[in-house]
Amino acid sequence: MKLVLVSGRSGSGKSVLLRMLEDLGYYCVDNLPLPMMGTLLEQLTGNSELVAISVDIRNMPEKDTELEKHLTNLPKGVELLSFFLNSSDEVLLKRYNETRRLHPLSHSNISLKEAIQLEGRQLEPLAKIVDHYIDTSNLNIYDLNDQVREILLGNIDKELMIKFESFGFKHGMPTEADFMFDVRFLPNPHWEPELRPMTGLDKPVQDFLNQRPLVNKFIWQIENLLRTWLPDLERNNRSYLTIAIGCTGGQHRSVYVTERLAEHFKDGRHKVTTSHRELKNAKD
């Protein structure tokens, strides 16, 4: 089991980092008291190989020796990697003033600035023993994501899951699509009596459409468009991309184009899935 421990000063980006780890497939637990960590890991053994836990000042042990004891006495087979996020007092003060959130150490007789400074002093022992110390004062969420991915995976390229979906406009447009392309202008196999009962998954329909230069040109241009912008979409911390292809009934043209595009993107760099809404609905 690989365990990532996320700690740091409040407002430095711990929750953001935890969401990034969740996108990478980690089972994430926020603000877990350290004495409960061993029990949690034992419960997850065999079920989750990637686990991430965040801790904050409110559930940290008071003694440094107790802290190190929790981090060294882990169940057998657990590989620990720890992060500490920090930001300057000025940046943290600005972030809290902008969000108007309450600092964990704020109370009636202490100011926000004093709470930020107090937390910094109390977390110093932990900051000295972590594997990776990251100052987020001048980082945005994308910069932080790149740093963490490089540490965990050895690269900053994000594996994007791409879903190609066919549909019929007469049955309504899908609401979850990031890109939508209308192929109703392409030659329609529906008007060929022998092809009408078939779908874009059948070879006669595929041969009919593959012989049309307009169809191949359209597929080529859509592929180029997507490949041009995929790197920027990946850098934008996106996990999923849904591309919808629509024709009139969702039986022939959209199905064929969806399959062709999916085939072109199954190059090992991306997880690609296909879905044919109207064909599925017909079966149901």
Curated annotation (Swiss-Prot):
| Keywords, in A-Z order | ATP-binding, GTP-binding, Nucleotide-binding
**Pfam families according to UniProt:** PapZ_C, RapZ-like_N
- Superkingdom in the source lineage: Bacteria
Q: Which HAMAP family match?
A: RapZ_like (MF_00636)
Residues where GTP binds: D56, I57, R58, N59
What Gene Ontology molecular-function terms does this entry list? Answer: ATP binding; GTP binding
Q: Which residues bind ATP?
A: G8, R9, S10, G11, S12, G13, K14, S15
Name of the protein in its database record? Nucleotide-binding protein swp_0674
Q: List the source organism.
A: Shewanella piezotolerans (strain WP3 / JCM 13877)
The record describes the protein's role as: Displays ATPase and GTPase activities.
* Similarity comment: Belongs to the RapZ-like family.
